[in-house]
Protein backbone atom coordinates (compact mmCIF):
# COMPACT_ATOMS: atom_id res chain seq x y z
CA UNK A 1 0.00 0.00 0.00
CA UNK A 2 1.33 3.41 -0.95
CA UNK A 3 0.48 6.20 1.49
CA UNK A 4 0.57 9.77 0.28
CA UNK A 5 0.20 12.71 2.66
CA UNK A 6 -2.12 15.54 1.76
CA UNK A 7 -1.70 18.09 4.53
CA UNK A 8 -3.45 21.46 4.44
CA UNK A 9 -1.28 23.62 6.68
CA UNK A 10 -3.89 26.40 6.62
CA UNK A 11 -5.90 24.30 9.07
CA UNK A 12 -3.26 24.70 11.77
CA UNK A 13 -2.86 27.66 14.10
CA UNK A 14 0.85 27.74 13.33
CA UNK A 15 3.25 25.78 11.15
CA UNK A 16 7.04 26.07 11.05
CA UNK A 17 9.28 24.87 8.25
CA UNK A 18 12.39 23.23 9.66
CA UNK A 19 15.19 21.06 8.35
CA UNK A 20 16.93 18.79 10.85
CA UNK A 21 20.62 18.23 10.28
CA UNK A 22 23.72 17.32 12.27
CA UNK A 23 27.41 18.13 12.18
CA UNK A 24 29.35 14.98 13.06
CA UNK A 25 26.54 14.05 15.45
CA UNK A 26 25.98 17.56 16.87
CA UNK A 27 22.32 18.33 16.21
CA UNK A 28 21.23 21.50 14.42
CA UNK A 29 17.60 22.29 13.59
CA UNK A 30 17.33 24.96 10.91
CA UNK A 31 14.12 27.01 10.87
CA UNK A 32 13.60 28.24 7.30
CA UNK A 33 9.99 29.44 7.38
CA UNK A 34 6.82 30.00 9.36
CA UNK A 35 8.06 32.80 11.62
CA UNK A 36 7.95 36.59 11.05
CA UNK A 37 11.00 38.41 9.73
CA UNK A 38 12.79 39.68 12.85
CA UNK A 39 12.96 43.45 13.32
CA UNK A 40 16.20 45.33 13.94
CA UNK A 41 19.03 47.31 12.37
CA UNK A 42 21.69 44.80 13.43
CA UNK A 43 21.71 41.04 13.81
CA UNK A 44 22.00 41.50 17.57
CA UNK A 45 18.85 43.65 17.53
CA UNK A 46 17.10 40.94 15.49
CA UNK A 47 18.20 38.34 18.03
CA UNK A 48 16.87 40.44 20.92
CA UNK A 49 13.60 41.03 19.06
CA UNK A 50 13.07 37.29 18.64
CA UNK A 51 13.97 36.75 22.29
CA UNK A 52 11.43 39.35 23.43
CA UNK A 53 8.55 38.55 21.07
CA UNK A 54 8.85 34.94 19.90
CA UNK A 55 10.90 33.05 22.46
CA UNK A 56 8.02 30.58 22.70
CA UNK A 57 9.01 29.40 19.21
CA UNK A 58 12.54 28.68 20.40
CA UNK A 59 11.37 26.76 23.45
CA UNK A 60 8.83 24.80 21.39
CA UNK A 61 11.57 23.69 18.99
CA UNK A 62 14.38 23.11 21.45
CA UNK A 63 12.66 21.45 24.41
CA UNK A 64 10.90 18.11 24.57
CA UNK A 65 8.79 16.68 23.03
CA UNK A 66 10.14 18.20 19.78
CA UNK A 67 13.68 18.66 21.05
CA UNK A 68 15.95 17.47 23.84
CA UNK A 69 18.40 18.68 26.48
CA UNK A 70 21.32 19.10 24.05
CA UNK A 71 19.31 20.57 21.17
CA UNK A 72 20.77 23.31 18.97
CA UNK A 73 19.25 25.21 16.09
CA UNK A 74 19.02 28.47 14.21
CA UNK A 75 16.54 30.82 12.57
CA UNK A 76 17.56 31.69 9.00
CA UNK A 77 16.51 35.20 8.00
CA UNK A 78 17.38 38.21 5.85
CA UNK A 79 20.89 39.56 6.53
CA UNK A 80 21.75 43.11 7.58
CA UNK A 81 25.17 43.12 5.93
CA UNK A 82 24.83 43.08 2.14
CA UNK A 83 27.94 40.89 1.85
CA UNK A 84 26.06 38.01 3.46
CA UNK A 85 23.93 35.41 1.70
CA UNK A 86 21.59 35.10 4.68
CA UNK A 87 21.25 35.97 8.34
CA UNK A 88 21.36 33.45 11.15
CA UNK A 89 20.35 33.53 14.80
CA UNK A 90 21.65 30.56 16.78
CA UNK A 91 19.74 29.05 19.69
CA UNK A 92 19.73 26.19 22.15
CA UNK A 93 17.77 25.15 25.23
CA UNK A 94 19.39 27.93 27.26
CA UNK A 95 18.65 30.84 24.93
CA UNK A 96 20.26 32.56 21.96
CA UNK A 97 23.91 32.40 20.92
CA UNK A 98 25.98 34.99 19.07
CA UNK A 99 28.00 32.35 17.25
CA UNK A 100 28.00 28.55 16.90
CA UNK A 101 30.55 26.65 14.83
CA UNK A 102 28.72 23.38 14.29
CA UNK A 103 25.42 25.16 13.55
CA UNK A 104 27.23 27.34 11.00
CA UNK A 105 28.30 24.18 9.18
CA UNK A 106 24.76 22.82 9.44
CA UNK A 107 23.18 26.07 8.23
CA UNK A 108 25.41 26.24 5.16
CA UNK A 109 24.73 22.60 4.33
CA UNK A 110 20.97 23.05 4.65
CA UNK A 111 20.97 26.34 2.72
CA UNK A 112 22.77 24.74 -0.22
CA UNK A 113 20.98 21.40 -0.30
CA UNK A 114 17.54 22.98 0.22
CA UNK A 115 18.19 25.48 -2.56
CA UNK A 116 18.07 28.56 -0.33
CA UNK A 117 21.32 29.85 -1.87
CA UNK A 118 22.75 29.34 -5.33
CA UNK A 119 25.53 26.78 -5.58
CA UNK A 120 27.59 24.87 -8.11
CA UNK A 121 29.86 21.87 -8.24
CA UNK A 122 33.15 22.40 -6.44
CA UNK A 123 33.97 25.16 -3.98
CA UNK A 124 31.26 27.64 -2.99
CA UNK A 125 31.68 30.69 -0.77
CA UNK A 126 28.72 31.27 1.53
CA UNK A 127 28.69 34.22 3.95
CA UNK A 128 26.49 34.29 7.05
CA UNK A 129 25.46 37.40 8.98
CA UNK A 130 25.39 36.42 12.66
CA UNK A 131 25.05 38.47 15.85
CA UNK A 132 28.82 38.07 16.32
CA UNK A 133 29.54 39.36 12.80
CA UNK A 134 30.21 37.94 9.35
CA UNK A 135 31.10 34.26 9.17
CA UNK A 136 32.76 33.31 5.89
CA UNK A 137 32.53 29.69 4.80
CA UNK A 138 33.62 27.50 1.92
CA UNK A 139 31.47 24.51 1.00
CA UNK A 140 32.57 21.72 -1.32
CA UNK A 141 29.66 20.41 -3.40
CA UNK A 142 29.77 17.13 -5.33
CA UNK A 143 26.79 15.72 -7.23
CA UNK A 144 24.56 18.31 -5.59
CA UNK A 145 25.51 17.28 -2.04
CA UNK A 146 27.69 19.16 0.41
CA UNK A 147 30.81 17.13 1.17
CA UNK A 148 32.47 19.53 3.59
CA UNK A 149 32.28 23.03 5.03
CA UNK A 150 35.13 25.10 6.43
CA UNK A 151 34.63 28.43 8.16
CA UNK A 152 36.52 31.55 9.12
CA UNK A 153 35.24 32.77 12.45
CA UNK A 154 34.88 36.37 13.58
CA UNK A 155 38.01 37.97 15.12
CA UNK A 156 38.95 36.24 18.39
CA UNK A 157 40.99 37.72 21.22
CA UNK A 158 41.94 37.36 24.87
CA UNK A 159 39.83 39.84 26.84
CA UNK A 160 40.92 39.53 30.48
CA UNK A 161 43.66 37.34 31.97
CA UNK A 162 44.31 36.28 35.57
CA UNK A 163 40.71 36.62 36.72
CA UNK A 164 39.44 34.94 39.88
CA UNK A 165 36.12 34.09 41.52
CA UNK A 166 35.38 32.27 44.75
CA UNK A 167 33.12 29.23 44.48
CA UNK A 168 32.21 27.25 47.61
CA UNK A 169 35.09 28.87 49.49
CA UNK A 170 37.72 28.07 46.84
CA UNK A 171 39.39 30.68 44.64
CA UNK A 172 39.41 29.67 40.97
CA UNK A 173 41.54 31.36 38.31
CA UNK A 174 40.46 31.74 34.69
CA UNK A 175 40.89 33.74 31.49
CA UNK A 176 38.10 35.44 29.55
CA UNK A 177 38.40 35.24 25.77
CA UNK A 178 36.15 36.06 22.83
CA UNK A 179 35.51 33.82 19.84
CA UNK A 180 31.99 34.79 18.81
CA UNK A 181 30.88 34.76 22.44
CA UNK A 182 32.74 35.46 25.67
CA UNK A 183 34.23 32.31 27.23
CA UNK A 184 35.71 31.71 30.67
CA UNK A 185 38.62 29.27 30.23
CA UNK A 186 39.56 27.26 33.32
CA UNK A 187 42.68 25.12 33.79
CA UNK A 188 41.57 21.93 35.57
CA UNK A 189 44.96 21.34 37.21
CA UNK A 190 43.99 23.86 39.93
CA UNK A 191 40.85 21.85 40.79
CA UNK A 192 40.29 18.69 42.82
CA UNK A 193 37.83 17.09 40.40
CA UNK A 194 40.38 15.15 38.37
CA UNK A 195 40.77 14.53 34.66
CA UNK A 196 37.94 15.36 32.28
CA UNK A 197 36.03 12.19 31.47
CA UNK A 198 32.50 10.79 31.50
CA UNK A 199 32.51 10.29 35.27
CA UNK A 200 33.65 13.82 36.07
CA UNK A 201 31.30 15.61 33.65
CA UNK A 202 28.51 16.15 36.26
CA UNK A 203 30.94 17.77 38.69
CA UNK A 204 32.43 20.01 36.00
CA UNK A 205 28.97 20.93 34.76
CA UNK A 206 27.81 21.93 38.25
CA UNK A 207 30.95 23.99 38.84
CA UNK A 208 30.71 25.63 35.43
CA UNK A 209 27.13 26.77 36.03
CA UNK A 210 28.07 28.23 39.42
CA UNK A 211 31.03 30.04 37.87
CA UNK A 212 28.93 31.42 35.03
CA UNK A 213 26.48 32.94 37.48
CA UNK A 214 29.15 34.52 39.68
CA UNK A 215 31.28 35.78 36.78
CA UNK A 216 28.38 37.65 35.20
CA UNK A 217 27.52 39.22 38.56
CA UNK A 218 31.06 40.25 39.51
CA UNK A 219 33.11 40.78 36.34
CA UNK A 220 31.90 43.22 33.66
CA UNK A 221 32.63 42.43 30.02
CA UNK A 222 31.92 44.48 26.89
CA UNK A 223 32.90 43.76 23.31
CA UNK A 224 34.76 46.78 21.84
CA UNK A 225 32.47 46.97 18.78
CA UNK A 226 29.39 44.81 19.35
CA UNK A 227 26.56 44.91 21.89
CA UNK A 228 27.77 41.75 23.65
CA UNK A 229 28.24 42.11 27.40
CA UNK A 230 27.91 38.69 29.04
CA UNK A 231 30.07 35.61 29.47
CA UNK A 232 28.03 32.85 27.88
CA UNK A 233 30.18 29.76 28.36
CA UNK A 234 32.66 28.20 30.77
CA UNK A 235 35.15 25.76 29.28
CA UNK A 236 37.52 23.51 31.22
CA UNK A 237 40.82 22.30 29.81
CA UNK A 238 43.50 19.99 31.15
CA UNK A 239 46.31 17.58 30.27
CA UNK A 240 45.54 14.81 27.81
CA UNK A 241 45.62 11.43 29.61
CA UNK A 242 48.32 9.05 28.35
CA UNK A 243 49.44 11.56 25.73
CA UNK A 244 52.91 9.95 25.62
CA UNK A 245 51.33 6.66 24.53
CA UNK A 246 49.39 8.17 21.64
Regions found by a protein language model. Give the residues of each.
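Active-site proximal loop and beta-alpha junction motif in alpha/beta enzyme cores
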Residues: 2-99, 106-246
Amino acid sequence: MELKANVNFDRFEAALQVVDAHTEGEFCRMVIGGFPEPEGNTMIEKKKWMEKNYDNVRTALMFEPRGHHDMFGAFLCEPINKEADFGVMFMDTGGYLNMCGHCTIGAVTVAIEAGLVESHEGENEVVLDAPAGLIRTKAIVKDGKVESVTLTNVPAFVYKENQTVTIDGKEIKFTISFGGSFFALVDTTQLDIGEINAKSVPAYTALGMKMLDVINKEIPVKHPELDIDTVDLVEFYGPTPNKDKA
